Amino acid sequence: MPRYELALILKAMRRPETAAALKRTIESLMDRGAIVRNLESLGERALPYRISSHSQQHSRGGYFLVDFYAPTSAVENILEHLARDIDVVRPNIVKHPLTQEVKECDGIVPVPLEEKLYSTKRRKK
C-alpha cells in the first residue's frame, strides 16, 4: 500500500468538537482500509482567504496532517467522504514523497577563470 498524507482544514471549533471531528475522520480512514501512522496538529489560524464550504463562509480553521497507508482504490472514496463532512472545510490527499538516498555534495567545481575572462582569439596588431 502506498503512503499518503492528508492535509485537512477543519472549521474553527472548540476543543471537544474538534477532537470529535478528528476521531470521526480517523475512524472513516480506518473503515476504508487505511493504516494511520501519525496525526499532527498545526494549530488554528486565519485562513489565507475566505473559504465557502457547506453554505458557510470560513475565515479561521484548524490545520491538521494525517500520515497514512491506504490502497490506491480507496483514496477517491476517502476524499468523497471527507468532502461531505460538515466540519471539514478543505481535505487534500497527496502521495507521500518517497524517502530517497541523499547524495553528498561534491563541493564547488573550480572553473578556469582565464578561459572565461580572456578571449582565446588573437588580437590584430
UniProtKB/Swiss-Prot annotation:
<dbReference type="GO" id="GO:0032543">
    <property type="term" value="P:mitochondrial translation"/>
</dbReference>
<keyword id="KW-0687">Ribonucleoprotein</keyword>
<dbReference type="GO" id="GO:0005763">
    <property type="term" value="C:mitochondrial small ribosomal subunit"/>
</dbReference>
<dbReference type="GO" id="GO:0005743">
    <property type="term" value="C:mitochondrial inner membrane"/>
</dbReference>
<dbReference type="InterPro" id="IPR000529">
    <property type="entry name" value="Ribosomal_bS6"/>
</dbReference>
<dbReference type="Pfam" id="PF01250">
    <property type="entry name" value="Ribosomal_S6"/>
</dbReference>
<keyword id="KW-0689">Ribosomal protein</keyword>
<comment type="subunit">
    <text>Component of the mitochondrial ribosome small subunit (28S) which comprises a 12S rRNA and about 30 distinct proteins.</text>
</comment>
<dbReference type="GO" id="GO:0019843">
    <property type="term" value="F:rRNA binding"/>
</dbReference>
<comment type="similarity">
    <text>Belongs to the bacterial ribosomal protein bS6 family.</text>
</comment>
<dbReference type="GO" id="GO:0005739">
    <property type="term" value="C:mitochondrion"/>
</dbReference>
<protein>
    <recommendedName>
        <fullName>Small ribosomal subunit protein bS6m</fullName>
    </recommendedName>
</protein>
<dbReference type="InterPro" id="IPR014717">
    <property type="entry name" value="Transl_elong_EF1B/ribsomal_bS6"/>
</dbReference>
<dbReference type="GO" id="GO:0003735">
    <property type="term" value="F:structural constituent of ribosome"/>
</dbReference>
<keyword id="KW-0496">Mitochondrion</keyword>
<dbReference type="InterPro" id="IPR035980">
    <property type="entry name" value="Ribosomal_bS6_sf"/>
</dbReference>
